[in-house]
Amino acid sequence: TLEVGGTFNHFCQRLGIEQAEQKILHSPFDYPNQSLLCVPRYLPATNQNNTLQSLGEMLLPIIEANKGRCFVLCTSYLMMRGLAEYFRENSELSILLQGEMPKAKLLEQFIHETHSVLVATSSFWEGVDVRGDALSLVIIDKLPFTAPDEPLLKARIEDCRLQGGDPFNDIQIPEAVITLKQGVGRLIRDVTDRGAVIICDNRLVMRNYGETFLKSLPNSTRTRDLNKVVQFLQNEKMD
């Protein structure tokens, strides 16, 4: 989880470690066969007024085809509440929303109900372990960059500038990479798990820094076709 782009340089820098032996151990999971990563084509523009509804319209058929069993991890409370409201108005699936009950109870209900959707934000991106058929689809609304006006980050950005560094590449990208890895990591928790991750952010494939994110994620099979996601989730062989 701590490596970014194949190295621990960011982690070592945060701890003030100048020299250290680095070793990355291979995962026991067979990601190419166990998981599919999709960055969909034709994503709604983030500056459109109807972005939330357009995103809901795009995602709901995939969620329903999978009969729930889905985490929707959001980067803002506004998106979290908006998507949950859209799903509740347009689907018969059980839609669970972070904040409506304690975290442990939410997870218990999600696992018990089987065909449910959990819409959540920050606290569910890490430290959550759902194994087996209860969870086979993780959707992430966009890359988890921390707002640059967040006080601690703002101070670190200023310190980086004073030292002649590049705050975006030295701080903001590595931290967003680590957070994204944590979110994606909710899916495959066991060697028998199988499922798909959908990341609704074209910057992964349209911006130069997207490669840093992709290189840091598990080596899942990749697609931009949401139909391929449905096929994969329904255990059909992909072309």
Language-model segments: residues:
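ASCE RecA-like P-loop NTPase motor cores
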Residues: 1-239
